[in-house]
Amino acid sequence: MVAKILDGKQISKDYRQGLQEQVEALKEKGYTPKLSVILVGNDGASQSYVNSKKKAAEKIGMISEIVHLDEDTSEEDVLKELDRLNNDDSVSGILVQVPLPKQVSEQKILEAINPEKDVDGFHPSNIGKLYIDEQTFVPCTPLGIMEILKHADIDLEGKNAVVIGRSHIVGQPVSKLLLQANATVTILHSRTKDMHSHLKDADVIVSAVGQPGLVTKDDVKEGAVIVDVGNTPDENGKLKGDVEFEEVKEVAGAITPVPGGVGPLTITMVLNNTLLAEKMRRGIE
């Protein structure tokens, strides 16, 4: 068996086409979704990522702006900028690019975003709504993972899904989404004993720990679906996933590559959530 390659770039391209059509329909009603991104400092990777989000938003007809603040900007001034965006009726969605400089509390900033504009889905209010099954903004990488799984030809109901990693950004929220899809979910982490036995029983494996080579062919049962969220640069700057792709694809039923798997969908879901934010505040289904 050679696995089906779950091409995140193509899935993302198709999904964005649908978003573009919805944006055009909104514009006909007189509304244009706008994404505002706060970037503090000059971290090269962050700048590149923010520019990718801006470009992607504009390509589907949204307005996007980058609010670029100096590295030494005080927490108070970041909060002031955030307050301005919270109260700007033209802004549909806000996200703050992390990491932030040491003088700025990430938690304090994330909690200061208007929950109705929190397109990253990191505000405690939105996290809480996710866990009681209310409509809310779901973190973008987990949302992207679920979209990828739709293309994996697997009915998640009753399946054993194993998530490696318990972060608030990926591991925990994707576990909740898998539960909502009626999968039986196990979360593995750094204190888990005998990780192999859990993995070997899994119909679906989502690995999100940033540990290259963690999942090998011996860990995977034949036909399992593998979603690799890891993206750790090696000494040459090449991105490596958590999964040994070349060997695992020989036994898996479907697998995401790194790069080109989950990454493109993460940005796509930022756009999805920005569109959702605009629709919700305008009372449009």
Curated annotation (Swiss-Prot):
Function description: Catalyzes the oxidation of 5,10-methylenetetrahydrofolate to 5,10-methenyltetrahydrofolate and then the hydrolysis of 5,10-methenyltetrahydrofolate to 10-formyltetrahydrofolate.
Subunit structure: Homodimer.
GO biological process: L-histidine biosynthetic process; methionine biosynthetic process; purine nucleotide biosynthetic process; tetrahydrofolate interconversion
Chain coiled-coil ranges: none
Residue sites binding NADP(+) per the record: G165, R166, S167, S190
Keyword Hydrolase: yes
Pathway note: One-carbon metabolism; tetrahydrofolate interconversion
Pfam families: THF_DHG_CYH, THF_DHG_CYH_C
Gene Ontology molecular function terms on file: methenyltetrahydrofolate cyclohydrolase activity; methylenetetrahydrofolate dehydrogenase (NADP+) activity
EC number(s) stated in the UniProt entry for this protein: 1.5.1.5, 3.5.4.9
Family matches, as PANTHER family: C-1-TETRAHYDROFOLATE SYNTHASE, CYTOPLASMIC, C-1-TETRAHYDROFOLATE SYNTHASE, CYTOPLASMIC-RELATED
Record keywords, A-Z: Amino-acid biosynthesis, Histidine biosynthesis, Hydrolase, Methionine biosynthesis, Multifunctional enzyme, NADP, One-carbon metabolism, Oxidoreductase, Purine biosynthesis
Similarity field: Belongs to the tetrahydrofolate dehydrogenase/cyclohydrolase family.
Lineage: Bacteria, Bacillati, Bacillota, Bacilli, Bacillales
Reactions listed under catalytic activity: (6R)-5,10-methylene-5,6,7,8-tetrahydrofolate + NADP(+) = (6R)-5,10-methenyltetrahydrofolate + NADPH; (6R)-5,10-methenyltetrahydrofolate + H2O = (6R)-10-formyltetrahydrofolate + H(+)
Protein name: Bifunctional protein FolD
InterPro entries linked: Aminoacid_DH-like_N_sf, NAD(P)-bd_dom_sf, THF_DH/CycHdrlase, THF_DH/CycHdrlase_cat_dom, THF_DH/CycHdrlase_NAD-bd_dom
Entry GO CC: cytosol
Annotated signal sequence range: none
